[in-house]
């Protein structure tokens, strides 16, 4: 860091965050100096638009595009069938593909989703991941309490990850910190609205569904600020409410799918 001509991070917001005490881990002074000198820059990661393309993806039940967005619902049925959940088109399906660790906000997810389930909201949760034993067990317990609302696979399966991206309505990423993140970019591509904490690359790639952004038709997902159960729960409620307005929801989905976060775009910033 001292002798580098240039320093890059994987998102602009993370480049700012590492100049603070909270994220700098003792290097915030040096990094702040490099930022003032114009030698610290954040460049958002990109994704492979060929590997992650709902129009050609062989791992999903039914291919679709912006022009054939109705076919996305076939993938929702497929993921409900995979997890032995009732085939309910009007249920808001929340997807989670993640390491089950504190950094990813898994505890917040379990607590907030439990609140919504206890309240009787029409949601379903489908999870794929592995990690800390206590979180794995908490998810198993939640599945046992709500077998018609929660599906859990402990481990990782690439095909299932693609199907969750295609079949979910909302993708959960309530990370405590996230230098860039890729799943929110996959989710945008697949028209699955990311629900994220406003940090790192999540902040740079998701536009919140605020009233103003909905009016301007720039919204692509949902954001919340503080890593607390209450804030995540409030964001979930906003997603549930917007899902009950299908015409507006569809517009947000289309806007999300029209975003381009491919490496072809990101690589230009390195030139």
What are these regions (language model features)?
Residues 1-271:
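Catalytic cores of nucleotide-sugar-dependent glycosyltransferases that transfer UDP/GDP/TDP-activated
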């Amino acid at each position: 860091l001292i002798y580098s001509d240039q320093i890059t991070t994987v998102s602009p917001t993370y480049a700012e965050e590492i100049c603070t005490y909270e994220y700098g881990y003792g290097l915030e002074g040096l990094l702040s100096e490099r930022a003032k000198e114009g030698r610290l820059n954040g460049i958002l990661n990109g994704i492979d638009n060929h590997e992650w393309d709902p129009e050609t993806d062989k791992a999903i039940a039914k291919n679709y595009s912006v022009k054939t967005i109705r076919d996305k619902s076939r993938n929702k049925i497929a993921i409900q069938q995979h997890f032995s959940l009732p085939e309910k088109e009007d249920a808001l399906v929340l997807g989670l593909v993640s390491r089950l660790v504190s950094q990813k906000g898994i505890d917040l997810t379990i607590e907030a989703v439990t609140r919504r389930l206890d309240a009787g909201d029409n949601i379903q949760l489908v999870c794929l991941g592995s990690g800390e034993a206590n979180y794995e067990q908490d998810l198993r317990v939640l599945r046992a309490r709500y077998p018609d609302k929660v599906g859990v696979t402990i481990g990782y399966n690439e095909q299932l990850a693609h199907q969750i991206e295609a079949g979910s309505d909302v993708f959960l990423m309530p990370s405590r910190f996230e230098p860039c993140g890729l799943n929110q970019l996959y989710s945008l591509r697949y028209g699955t609205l990311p629900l994220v904490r406003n940090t790192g690359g999540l902040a740079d790639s998701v536009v919140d569904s605020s009233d103003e952004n909905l009016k301007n038709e720039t919204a692509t997902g949902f954001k919340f600020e503080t890593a607390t159960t209450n804030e995540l729960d409030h964001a979930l409620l906003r997603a549930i409410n917007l899902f009950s307005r299908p015409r507006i929801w569809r517009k947000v989905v289309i806007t999300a799918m029209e975003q381009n976060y491919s490496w072809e775009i990101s690589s230009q910033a390195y030139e």
